[in-house]
Swiss-Prot record:
One of its GO terms (cellular component) is mitochondrion. SUPFAM superfamilies: Zn-binding ribosomal proteins. It comes from Reclinomonas americana. It comes from the Eukaryota. One of its GO terms (biological process) is translation. One of its GO terms (molecular function) is structural constituent of ribosome. Its main location: mitochondrion. This is Large ribosomal subunit protein bL32m. It is found in: Mitochondrion. Belongs to the bacterial ribosomal protein bL32 family. Keywords: Mitochondrion, Ribonucleoprotein, Ribosomal protein.
Length: 62
């Protein structure tokens, strides 16, 4: 198993974490809340809970 030769400095750790957190925020911004049922859904997609997309019913959930 690989072991680091030196302890990473605080500044290097912070720089790495900034990029990791930026990726996480980017992934979270792809989601929104459905206006009809307040369910979390992907933006520009049909809601899996109620079947609505932009104020119109696309398919009926039984």
């Amino acid at each position: 198993m690989a072991v680091p030769k030196r302890k990473p400095s605080v500044s290097r750790r912070k720089i790495r974490n900034v990029f990791i957190r930026a990726e996480m925020k980017k992934n979270l911004s792809n989601y929104s809340i459905c206006k009809h049922c307040n369910y979390v859904k992907k933006k520009h997609h049909i809601c899996n809970n109620c079947g609505y997309y932009k104020e119109s019913l696309i398919y009926k959930i039984v």
